[in-house]
Amino acid sequence: MSAKFGPAGNSEAFSAKYKTTLQAPGYLEAMGLDHYEYQCGRGVKVSDKIAFALKDKAKEHNITLSLHAPYFISLSSLEAEKRDNSINYILQSCDAASRMGADRIVIHSGSCAKISREDALELAKDTLTRARKTAVEQGFEHIVFCPETMGKVNQLGNLTEVLELCKLDDTFLPTIDFGHLNAREFGYIKGKAEYEKMLDEVENAVSYTHLRAHETSQDLV
């Protein structure tokens, strides 16, 4: 399997020398990297001008793109309105990703609220299924959904839960943030054996994935 490497957002080193994200593709190519994750964690606010320009720059410098959907998505909220809003945030992310030429969006699942993890997972499955159905209806069938592992115990998103979400649709792929998994398991990762165990679990569930090495702020696609 081929791999692509690149940052999620702009590093301090980049920001110290450059003024705009549109310069990121050239910067990454010069460093020997080939992927960039555009950050919409605080909301999807991407104009056509920026989206189309980034698409052109990424193509010029052989950089593939993904997009991180808003952090405030809550797939398993007890409030139906919040789940519906989460679907809208996902659709907004699909639209922005499509305009800039990205082929996948990274999705946080949110907290388990005051219900069991099993019930939260079922709500999340329903929300993601409805989001995918609407995305396809709106012409975003080419956008891959990538649920991400979460870093806090009260959040839905341990490795098993993320893999369960990805079984909903062939176009769903897990985003595995090892830093998050290590945090939620209180320093579980000690070395190679723990990584191998987690990767074996992923391999048994899906054949292709989106991995994030949290410590270096790099993505492995």
Language-model features: locations:
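N-terminal pre-domain/capping segments
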Residues: 1-95
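Hydrophobic faces of well-ordered beta-strands that scaffold small-molecule active sites
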Residues: 5-9, 36-38, 65-67, 105-107, ...
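Active-site beta-loop-alpha junctions enriched in small/polar residues
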Residues: 8-12, 39-43, 70-72, 110-112, ...
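Active-site glycine- and acidic-residue-rich loops that bind
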Residues: 150-161, 183-199
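Active-site acidic/histidine proton-transfer and metal-coordination neighborhood
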Residues: 59, 76-175
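Conserved small/polar residues in nucleotide/adenosyl-binding loops
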Residues: 209-216
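Well-ordered, non-membrane alpha-helical segments in soluble/globular domains
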Residues: 21, 124-128, 192-199
